[in-house]
Regions:
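Auxiliary, metal-adjacent structural segments of Zn-dependent hydrolase domains
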Residues: 1-67
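Active-site recognition of the HExxH zinc-binding catalytic motif
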Residues: 72-85
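Substrate-binding clefts and substrate-entry loops adjacent to catalytic sites
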Residues: 84-95
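Post-HExxH zinc-binding segment in Zn-dependent metallohydrolases
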Residues: 94-128
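Short pre-active-site segment immediately N-terminal to the catalytic Zn-binding motif
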Residues: 58-74, 94-98
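Long, well-structured alpha-helical subdomains associated
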Residues: 114-189
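Non-catalytic architectural context of zinc metalloproteases
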Residues: 3-5, 71, 137
Length: 189
């Protein structure tokens, strides 16, 4: 793993965030021999940039907001770098990650349960699910894996995934409405 920190990031990077970045990078074997510049951003949770020079990759940069950084954000930005690789030497690879924010969220969640610590930003889901993300995280991850498999034969796999997520939210709501909210005790006079 080759990481270069920008001067701004050197000033702000906490040990926790540095360990999170290294742990996340270990789950991206495609980036193992690549120098990745890690910078700081104030405006967004994160961003990723792949710079090309004369048709080949010159630099790969991710920028993160250190305060409150999550594995999901780090994984999402690293997945963007892999999407950028698709335009270079990997362009003939059949299993490349398609470009786009929703696709990036789907492939990030499917990669490893580590990246399920926070709800994805771009995949549509009910607010209730986002608020109670830990209850749904692993099930949504399984749906993301299924959507990637479905992609080979079904072009609207993202629409399918978002519909399944919506159904999942409704199912859990119905299950909770059937069960009593509080136990009742018999009233004896």
């Amino acid at each position: 793993m080759l990481i270069r920190l920008t001067p701004q990031m050197k000033q702000r990077l906490t040990r926790r965030a540095h360990e999170m970045i290294e742990h996340s990078l270990a789950l991206f074997p495609e980036l193992q021999d690549t120098l990745i510049t890690v910078g700081y951003t104030r405006k967004h949770l994160g961003s990723a940039t792949v710079i090309y020079r004369k048709g080949s990759i010159d630099r790969m940069i991710i920028r993160l907001k250190v305060r409150g950084v999550t594995y999901q954000t780090i994984g999402h930005e690293l997945t963007h770098l892999i999407q950028g690789l698709a335009h270079g030497a990997r362009s003939a690879a059949p299993d490349k990650i398609p470009s786009g924010e929703k696709q990036c969220d789907i492939w990030t969640l499917a990669r490893d349960p580590l990246f399920c610590d926070d709800a994805p930003t771009y995949v549509k889901m009910p607010r209730r699910m986002r608020e109670r993300w830990p209850d749904y995280a692993l099930t949504v991850r399984e749906l993301c894996i299924a959507a990637i498999q479905k992609r080979h034969t079904y072009r609207q796999y993202i629409r399918w995934l978002e519909e399944e997520i919506r159904k999942l939210s409704k199912q859990s709501r119905q299950a909770k409405s059937i069960a009593p909210a509080q136990l009742t005790l018999p009233f004896i006079i």
